[in-house]
Amino acid sequence: MVNDIIADSLTRLRNASMRRLEFTQLYYAKIVVSILEIFKEKGFIKDFNVKDKDKKQSVYVQLAYDEKGHSKISEVKRLSKPGRRVYKQKNELKRFKNGYGVIVVSTSKGVITNEEAYRQNVGGEVLCSIW
């Protein structure tokens, strides 16, 4: 059993992109699906789908690459960990990496990006960053 499913998912994405794999498989969790929806919206992954197999759900992710074959994921980091939670207020969630990167924040309004949290005037737990 995995203790931190978000960190495990991010590590699997990072390893698959470094190996230039087309697909990778992740454990299913609602929060992982929420994070993947943001990654897809921002163009870091092409697509993902949830599949049932023997009463266990898995998420299959299709990674995105540019025309030269380079991964669109340069780096992905887990910021808030089970042993050390990181929370940020609205004014601390402005642009990240000059707009090229995204911080994923868990707020009272759901899992959203740092820019959306700033616009909606909410803070929350900073889950991960990607660029």
Swiss-Prot record:
Keyword Transport: no
Protein's GO biological process: translation
One annotated GO molecular function: structural constituent of ribosome
One GO CC term, this protein: ribonucleoprotein complex
Pfam families xrefs: Ribosomal_S8 (PF00410)
Coiled coil: none
Domain of life of the source: Bacteria
UniProt entry tagged with the keyword Ribonucleoprotein: yes
Keywords tagged on the record: Ribonucleoprotein, Ribosomal protein, RNA-binding, rRNA-binding
NCBIfam families: PRK00136.1 (NF001109)
UniProt family annotation: Belongs to the universal ribosomal protein uS8 family.
Subunit structure of this chain's protein: Part of the 30S ribosomal subunit. Contacts proteins S5 and S12.
Record's function text: One of the primary rRNA binding proteins, it binds directly to 16S rRNA central domain where it helps coordinate assembly of the platform of the 30S subunit.
Name of the protein in question: Small ribosomal subunit protein uS8
Source organism (scientific name): Helicobacter pylori (strain G27)
